[in-house]
Amino acid sequence: MSTLRLKEAKVPSVQFVGDDDVLSHILDREGGTKLKKEKVQLLVNPQKVIKKAECELEKSDLEVLEDQNYVEVLGRNIQESLGNGSAVDGRNKVYSFQHRKHPEEMTKLALELAKTSGKIDPLASNDPKITKNIARKSKGHSSEKAPLENNNKNEFPSIQPHNVRKRLIASRSHCDSESEYSASSSEDDEEVAKDDEEDTNVVRCSKKSQGQNRLLPAPVSKEILPKKRKRDKAGDLVEEYFEAHSSSKVLTSDRTLQKLRRARVDQKTLRNLLSKFVPSFSTEIGQLNQQHERLFDKWILQLRLGFNIVLYGLGSKRDLLEKFRTTMLQDSIHVVINGFFPGISVKSILNSITEDVLSHMGTFQSVLDQRDWIMNRFKEDSSLELFLLIHNLDSQMLRGDNSQQILGQLSSLRNVYLIASIDHLNAPLMWDHAKQSLYNWLWYETTTYSPYTEETSYENSLLVKQSGSLPLSSLIHVLRSLTPNARGIFRLLMKYQLDNQDCPSYIGLSFQDFYQQCREAFLVNSDLTLRAQLTEFRDHKLIRTKKGTDGVEYLLIPVDSGTLADFLEKEEEEES
């Protein structure tokens, strides 16, 4: 029996001890003394964490993991105490701490937990103050503590909660400015008092950081605000663009140069004023003209050989051709044709040849008959020679196909010599291969840099009082681009105005009477067609409409009677 009792006494008894029993045992054995708080204990109260875990254990698994991590940290403290050489005397000294704590340890703990969990805060890693605190070592610790702590980091990984990391980051920037705690060898009561002061400082810093975090906006919102402003600004620009282009009306100013209140001078006065102006490069222009004048003998020879000469280049060539006429054609029969004149036509050119050169006073049925008679006369009499000098062969009055065809046929005669000038850039487009063979051109570049004084004397100018010559050229140019019915409508109105030109009370032709005349001539079939045609005339400023005292609309051509008579005569000549 004694041996059995001894064996039973030697058998150890096993009893389960929970975490609550361990903590209560620790508190009872310490006798109410305040435990030294390690790195995690600065932010986490063990009793509160355990009570919270007991109450909310069934709510979520994440809080259970936090309790387990806390226990792991407690186990870690055991190994730290062993590494520091602290005595563990049974269960009494398991959780006792023999080394001092410094303010930097809270930051170190946060960085260690962030590294072990694999989630490093980018703000903490980029802060130069944090790197400075990490590199600093406390005076009271031995040099062997660093490798042990590194090993413990790998041994006990823990997950740092988001709210704890946020508080650590916020408190770091405010607590660094506080005075550092200097280590010294003192008694236990002084260490406890200093630990209490550190706890109060940490709590104050955490409260300040929490209050400032509530007041200050997050840094992400500061980055978002400029983007929102840019988007709003871009949206405003888009809306302003569409608002500016939404209206279909185009606002243009009606203040033209014609409304300038300046007295207009006549052509002679303007010419006298321009003649007093001497250009600064007049010497060079004179030398250039002398080079062109040396070609006069060559031109005469080439004309005699059956070629015709065309001059092109920048500047007026009228003075150059006039010098050629006065020096080389004194003893020859020649005709000078001013193509820039608004009233010039092929009919007038042929009349000058038949009347002044051939001394024929008869009439011809058409322009073609007159052309044939002139050609036959020069072919029959080989002794007849004629020099034609045409200024601006590409003018609006001579650039027509019929005009160029007749002039080309005349220049193809052996005893008719043609020398002409062109100024338009696209003047060669007037001639096809057939006309080119008739003219048989020799091209000479004769740049003179002279002003186009005579050529532009008949053009519209705001400084010169104009006669009816310019409206005639404009009238012919516009009507040539219209349909035959449109020309017939305008001819009816023009004839009616010429018939009533001697009536002083004539204010125009009423619209109803004009519509009746157009219907009788089978030109229109409705008043809408006539109004559309009149709108085109009005756009070209060929007609003017006004209402009389009786409210009737009257039509009037704003051109003098002499110009209208010349235009009507030319139209009849071309039709015949």
UniProtKB/Swiss-Prot annotation:
A single Pfam family, by name?
WHD_ORC2
**TM spans, by residue?**
none
Annotated compartments: Nucleus
Set out the biological process GO terms recorded for this chain's protein.
DNA replication initiation
For whether the record's keyword set contains Phosphoprotein, the answer is yes
What GO cellular component term, any one, is given?
Answer: inner kinetochore
Keywords, ordered alphabetically: DNA replication, Nucleus, Phosphoprotein
Residue numbers of Phosphoserine PTMs: 246
Query: Which cysteines are cross-linked by disulfides?
Result: none
Q: Residue ranges under compositional bias (Acidic residues)?
A: 186-200
The Involved in LRWD1-binding repeat units are at 1-100
Where along the chain is composition biased (Polar residues)? 149-161
Q: Name one GO molecular function term.
A: DNA replication origin binding
Annotated region Disordered: the residues are: 119-218
Modification type Phosphothreonine: residues: 116
Q: Describe its partners and assembly state.
A: Component of ORC, a complex composed of at least 6 subunits: ORC1, ORC2, ORC3, ORC4, ORC5 and ORC6. ORC is regulated in a cell-cycle dependent manner. It is sequentially assembled at the exit from anaphase of mitosis and disassembled as cells enter S phase. Interacts with DBF4. Interacts with MCM10. Interacts with LRWD1 throughout the cell cycle; this interaction, which occurs only with non-ubiquitinated form of LRWD1, prevents LRWD1 ubiquitination and hence stabilizes the protein. Interacts with POLQ.
Indicate the family of this protein: Belongs to the ORC2 family.
Task: Write out the function statement from the record.
Answer: Component of the origin recognition complex (ORC) that binds origins of replication. DNA-binding is ATP-dependent. The specific DNA sequences that define origins of replication have not been identified yet. ORC is required to assemble the pre-replication complex necessary to initiate DNA replication. Binds histone H3 and H4 trimethylation marks H3K9me3, H3K20me3 and H4K27me3. Stabilizes LRWD1, by protecting it from ubiquitin-mediated proteasomal degradation. Also stabilizes ORC3.
**Official protein name in the record:** Origin recognition complex subunit 2
